[in-house]
Every structure is written in C-alpha cells, then in structure tokens.
From Swiss-Prot:
Location within or outside the cell: Cytoplasm
Biological process annotations from GO: histidyl-tRNA aminoacylation; L-histidine biosynthetic process
Entry protein name: ATP phosphoribosyltransferase regulatory subunit
GO cellular component labels: cytoplasm
UniProt miscellaneous comment: This function is generally fulfilled by the C-terminal part of HisG, which is missing in some bacteria such as this one.
Protein's UniProt keywords contain Cytoplasm: yes
Gene of this entry: hisZ
Family of this protein: Belongs to the class-II aminoacyl-tRNA synthetase family. HisZ subfamily.
GO molecular function: histidine-tRNA ligase activity
Function: Required for the first step of histidine biosynthesis. May allow the feedback regulation of ATP phosphoribosyltransferase activity by histidine.
CDD domains: HisRS-like_core
C-alpha cells in the first residue's frame, strides 16, 4: 500500500483538527449545561449493543444504517449505533424507571453505513434530549423550545420551524384498512407528493372517494397557520380532530413563547414515521435544505422495552452545528513559558493554570512558533518578579 493511501479516511468519515475540536468541545459544554439548567440528566449509552436490543422498536431505515459485526465472545450479532434515541428509551424504560416525568440528555458519536445527503458525514456526533412520562402539549412545547434554545446558544440563527403530525396519516390508514405493506407503499408515494398515484393505488384497494380525497389532500396541506383551518374542513369526520387540535395548541403556545420564530405546517411530511406517533418538527435555516434539528413524539417505543410511556424529544448533529454556528466567542490565547529552573517558576506556572490560563512550556534548543502554540503572551522574569508580557511588546512573533 502506498504511504499516501494510509492517510486516507473512508468516504464520509471525518476528523476534527485542534481548532474545530476546541470549538466543538466548547459547544458540547454549553449544550450540556443548558440541558442541565432545564432539568435534563446526562446518560452515556454504549457505542455497540446486541443487534436485537439496538434495533427493537425502530424501522428498517435505521437497520439499513447500522454497521453489524459478530461478538467474538458470544457469536451474537452486534451493531454500532446509528441513532442514540432508542438507546435512551431503553435506559428510561429498563434502567431508571422513575414514576413521574423523566428528562434525559445525551451526546455521543454514531456511525452510518451511508451518508444522508450529498457530501454528508457518516460519523455525526449526535446530541439531544428526551422527555418521558407526559403526553400533553406542554411537554411537546418544552422539547421544541429547548431545541431552539440549543441552536441559539451555539450560534445557529434565523431558524424557522416545520411542524407536522404523523397521527393524521396513521388515522386515515386505519380507516382505509390498509395492510402494513400497502401502508408503506402509500407512505412512499405521499413523500413524492404524487396525487395521481395515490388515487390509483387507493382505487385498486376499493377505498371510497371521500377517503381518497383526504389522502390526496395531504400532498397540498402545507403552508402557514391557515393550513390548519383548511385541514379541519377537508379532513372533517375522519377522526383526526385530536391531531389537528394538538397542532393548533402547539402553534399557539409557540407564538406565545417564541413569537419571532416563523412556522410552516406540512401535514404530508412524515419525518421519522417508523417510530414517531404524534407531533413532529424540524428546524431549518436559510440556504440549507437539510434540517439542523428534528424531533417529535414517539409514545410507542418504550413498550418494546417492557414499559409503555409517552415520550418526546429531539436530536441534532454537533459537528454540523459548529460548522453552521456564528458564535462570537473567541478562544483566549495562552502564555509561553520558556523552560526555567529559576526560583518560583513552577509555582507561578501552577498558579496561572489554576486560574484557567493555558501555559505552554518552551523547551531548550527548539524553535517556538507562537501562532502554532496558541500563545500571545510570555512569562518573563524581570527584576526578580515573574511577569506576563505580550509577545508583540517583546519584539517577537
């Protein structure tokens, strides 16, 4: 193998160099502190699990995204997590088992077999928060507000919301009496907004004209708040009233607490349909087609772990947030400390580090590049006193 090929990383797999890594670590700390201030406890699930545990209660999409390997100790199949959300649901249902509301947050690397979108990463750093044990719009709103505040504290601005409710499609499917295979086929057609294909498929399955019209209407029920009023008329008598009421309540509360955040509604958008059960949302910024944060309600996932409970949450890619963020926070540069055995040198270095300063030793017989070391000051002994002098004032750098 040529030595140059040893430098290559797999396609879609990236690494962070010092500046980017420091920015990401700063963002990580800010987010964990934010989640803590809202009452969310940090959990750290394992990177790999037995495959049946990792994929329980999720759809085939996640299974296709999961790298699989054989455990050399047991011979059982294991998977490298592609999504931390199911792991946190397992922890909440099996390990913690609180009687009231449980709030958990997490951050960690995930691995995807394929990148999501052109030029996308296959090794995101997923960060998110989950709330268990409450099914009302209050918890939907809390999670939504926390997601938007998380974007704000890492410098992602000009966010607008896209809201939907997968319960509308699910309720219509039940009335149409479709099989799981037919439901999946209809789901794929709906994502393409192909009205004629929807009509043809449902006619072939003897679905009545009124219900066919409702399914086709989902392709065009998108826009501002007026869409919800239109949906009440178009979908009247279909049993989706509760879902529309939830959307209206969340929209009203969002207007109250986040009046400057634009909202868009799309009743045909079924993001995360395989495990979401109710309200779903995504956050977008101008000039970017992919969501920077997404979440929603997934009340059924705890049942497969032996404890059914309401659940809602969100997730985002920390590496992407750092790239997109416009935070003005700057890194304080360090102090260069040429190696010395003079009295008080080590004591002064220790004191500076305890104060939070970055102090970098300069070794004898080496050339020091202050920019590479990240230093703009130097520790100097003058008049038997250790002083901090700006490097530019010393005529260096």
């Amino acid at each position: 193998m040529p030595i140059t090929e040893r430098w290559l990383l797999p396609e879609g797999v990236g690494e962070l160099l010092p500046i980017e890594a420091e920015q990401m670590e700063r963002a990580r700390r800010v987010l964990i502190d934010l989640f803590h201030s809202w009452g969310y406890d940090l959990v750290v699930p394992p990177l790999i699990e037995y495959l049946e545990s990792l994929l329980t209660g999720v759809g085939t999409d996640l299974e296709l995204q999961t790298f699989k390997l054989t455990d050399q100790l047991t011979g059982r199949l294991m998977g490298v997590r592609a999504d931390i959300t199911p792991q946190v649901a397992r922890i909440a249902a099996h390990c913690i088992q609180r009687k009231g509301v449980t709030r958990l947050c997490y951050i960690g690397s995930v691995l995807h077999t394929l990148s999501q979108g052109l030029g996308g990463t296959r090794n995101p750093i997923q960060v998110g928060a989950e709330l268990y044990g409450h099914s009302g719009t209050e918890s939907d709103l809390e999670v939504l507000r926390l997601a938007l505040e998380a974007l704000d504290v890492v410098g992602v601005k000009q966010v607008h919301l896209d809201l939907g409710h997968v319960g509308i499609f699910r309720d219509l499917v039940l009335q149409a009496n479709l099989s799981p295979e037919e439901e999946y086929g209809l789901f794929n057609i709906l994502q393409r907004k192909a009205r004629d294909e929807i009509d043809t498929m449902l006619r072939n399955r003897d679905v009545g004209p009124q219900l066919r019209h409702m399914f086709m209407a989902l392709t065009s029920l998108n826009g501002g708040r007026e869409v919800l009023d239109e949906a009440e008329q178009v979908l009247a008598g279909s049993g989706v009233e509760q879902a529309l009421t939830t959307l209206k309540e969340v929209a009203t509360l969002t207007d109250k607490y986040l009046p400057r955040v634009p909202m868009h509604f799309d009743l045909g958008e079924l993001r995360g349909y395989r495990y979401h059960t109710g309200l779903v949302f995504a956050a977008y910024i101008p000039g970017r087609g992919q969501a920077v944060a997404q979440g929603g309600r997934y009340d059924d996932i705890g049942q497969v772990f032996g404890r059914a409970q309401p659940a809602t949450g969100f997730s985002m890619d920390l590496k992407e947030l750092v790239t997109l963020g416009s935070s003005t926070t700057t890194t304080r540069l360090g102090i260069f400390a040429p190696w010395s055995e003079a009295p008080g040198f080590e004591r002064e270095v220790a004191r500076l580090r305890q104060q939070g300063e970055r102090v970098v030793y300069g070794f004898p017989d080496t050339v020091s590049n202050y920019d590479e070391l990240g230093c703009d000051r130097e520790l100097v002994l003058k008049a038997k006193q250790w002083q901090i002098i700006e490097i530019r004032k010393l005529g260096r750098g």
